[in-house]
Amino acid sequence: MLDYNIMAKSSFKLKILYGEGDAEILASQADSIQKAGHQVTTVVGRRALEQALKTDAFDLVLLGPTLTRNDRHHLPYMVKKAHQGTRVLVMHADGGRHPYVDVATDTGRSIESILETIASMMAQEKLVTAQ
């Protein structure tokens, strides 16, 4: 089990845009991400996510498994077009590698596993920028 207090004290706090197709799943997952110390903006559906990208910039965009397959395919392009440096994590991989997705996870991974993936991704990025 992930210790949220340790995660909250990490050296980075990300500004995350998290989109799902299901509001209940979105609420429970977003709560866990906030407890890990990140600032989370939540949206339900593709149009709301597109609108959020027009009004603000984010460090990371999470595309949840309850978004449609079509949305999970097209939204990474839209994210990178709006903000090239924003990282994209798709929480339900459909197989092949998407050129605009920075990290993809398999279906059914726990939120703790997703948080570990985010921490690992950011630690790698920190190492690269420090060189």
Spell out what each predicted region is.
Residues 69, 74, 89-116:
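Alpha4 helix (beta4-alpha4-beta5 surface) of REC/receiver domains from two-component response regulators
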Residues 1-21, 32, 109-131:
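Non-catalytic signal-transmission and effector/linker regions of two-component phosphorelay proteins
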Residues 17, 41-42, 87-92:
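Short, hydrophobic beta-strand segments that form beta-sheet elements in well-ordered domains
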Residues 54-56, 79-85, 95:
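Conserved phosphotransfer cores of two-component systems
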Residues 23, 44-48, 109:
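Acidic phosphotransfer microenvironment of two-component signaling modules
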Residues 22-41:
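Two-component/phosphorelay signaling modules centered on CheY-like receiver
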Residues 61-83:
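Conserved phosphotransfer microenvironments
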Residues 42-60:
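Acidic, metal-coordinating helix/loop segments flanking the phosphotransfer/catalytic sites
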